[in-house]
Amino acid sequence: MDRRGFNRRMLLGGAAVVGTGAVATSLSVAPEAASADGPARTAPAGGEVRHIKLYAEKLADGQLGYGFEKGKATIPGPLIELNEGDTLHIEFENTLDVAASLHVHGLDYEISSDGTKLNRSDVEPGGTRTYTWRTHAPGRRKDGTWRAGSAGYWHYHDHVVGTEHGTGGIRKGLYGAVIVRRKGDILPDATHTIVFNDLLINNKPAHSGPDFEATVGDRVEFVVITHGEYYHTFHMHGHRWADNRTGLLTGPEDPSQVIDNKIVGPADSFGFQVIAGEGVGAGAWMYHCHVQSHSDMGMVGLFLVKKTDGTIPGYEPHEHGGQQTGAERRTGTGQRPEHAH
């Protein structure tokens, strides 16, 4: 069967996580995307009710992570993709020796799925709890005002480990990305999650990336999340995006500002898509925090854009290693899709 025929699936991301040997995964309901040299594929309508299992685990290096399977937790946790109108039931199991939880930004949920100690929606060591997230399309309220939809680049994280508000859990890696797509949104060839967490990226050691690969012409999506105590600026060399919900311009009259640098603070999240190497070609394109002292201290990674023959002009691997680390979704890689349950 053509892989494009799968509309409900869980895709393996193929990204190694430092110190764990685990594989980052992605839960996706989107059809396979096409590259920029062909017609763009788009997100379908939502309305599905889905069920997944998620674990909180301690990693071999002492950090913490979320995973779809025991023993396969990652930092960042699995990328979760939904379409407006979907409902997701998450059976959350806490394998840690301290209480943990799951809290999401941007989606709809009842107080029992808030994931905090203040309303007793956390999970004790060894316990389980079902968190339910709902999404909705935009529409007009009965009073005539407009209600925004759920579509956007969001994120989830622990809210109780270490302190009453979860500072320790976030610091050690209990976080991940959520994408809610609107019907008709353009789909990428690959999605990568980048988390500025204090002075680290995806909790990797300073000056070690993560680095992400693409081939010239690929449509690549980045989800950028900020945690910790600091404000940063996210900058990517050689590529630009629109400062709006999707990161894409809708046409020549779209008033959205086109940028290559964005100020971000704790709990901020945004996303965008670029065509790898568009107008600039292949290369080792740097992304980093543009607070100069932060980049000097190691908040730097590479967007490795290859020619079609696989080469990268002027690039020789150096200390910025760790290619394709963190949660990601890739399409067209020949990996076997798994049905979501």
Predicted regions and their residues:
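N-terminal, post-signal-peptide metal-ligating segments of extracellular/periplasmic oxidoreductases
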Residues: 2-130, 188-192, 196-220, 299-317, ...
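Short, structured patches in soluble enzyme cores that scaffold and shape functional sites
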Residues: 135, 160, 180-182, 195-198, ...
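Intrinsically disordered, low-complexity Ser/Thr- and acidic-rich flexible linkers and loops
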Residues: 141-147, 330, 336-341
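A contiguous, surface-exposed recognition patch within enzymatic or periplasmic domains that forms
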Residues: 187, 193-239, 243, 277-285
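C-terminal functional regions that serve as terminal interaction/effector modules
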Residues: 232, 259-326, 332-334
